[in-house]
Amino acid sequence: PFFKWYHRIYQVLMFFIFLGPIRLILLIISFIICCTITISIVAILKTLKCDLNKYRHMIIAHARFWLRIFLFCLGIGWIHVEGEFDEDARFMICNHIGLLDPIIMIQIRYLSFVIKKEFSEIPIIHDMIDVCDPIYVERSKPCGYTNKIISQAEDKSKDQIMIFPEGTVCNGNYMLKFHRSAFLTNYKVQPIV
């Protein structure tokens, strides 16, 4: 059916009066609960001197539930996956077109991310990211972190490594220069779109 202009205004008005605030409140609550419980579990495991690597997937599985609500509140209702993941690939590469890319990838797969070192200085975000066993890289140093990435790729007990080879968020209209770290190994690299 064709909607007239005043129907559209009514829809927008009702969204801002009713649905918008509810989604915003749910978004904030889901993020706070996710952070609180995840950080609490990690703190308890560290206090008990437990190996965090043994419980990493359990913690991420718990966080997925709350992050799924978070994504739903942002309007991401379904994540469609086509094709198969190559279990032999140690690296996955993807263009970084939005700030939600890592959260969406965590919903699909257990991954370890290559992340800029600045994120290790943000208190709550740092604690949440550490659950994924990230590799922090310093952009000011052009080399040196490649060895860390390769050594983590060689450890088959660890999760596959997700790299955004452009190293930053871009709009997807053009390609930036790729960092070579994932391509310097003999391991398979799986592209993700």
Regions found by a protein language model. Give the residues of each.
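Generic structural "secondary-structure junction" signal
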Residues: P21, E121, R139, N171, ...
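Catalytic core of membrane glycerolipid acyltransferases/transacylases, capturing the structured
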Residues: C35-F65, L71-L74, E84-C143
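Eukaryotic beta-rich interaction modules
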Residues: H7, F15-R23, I60-A61, L71-H80, ...
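Conserved Motif II region of HX4D acyltransferases
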Residues: D88-I93, F113, K148-V193
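Eukaryotic intrinsically disordered and solvent-exposed regulatory patches
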Residues: G77-H80, G98-D101, I122, N147-S151, ...
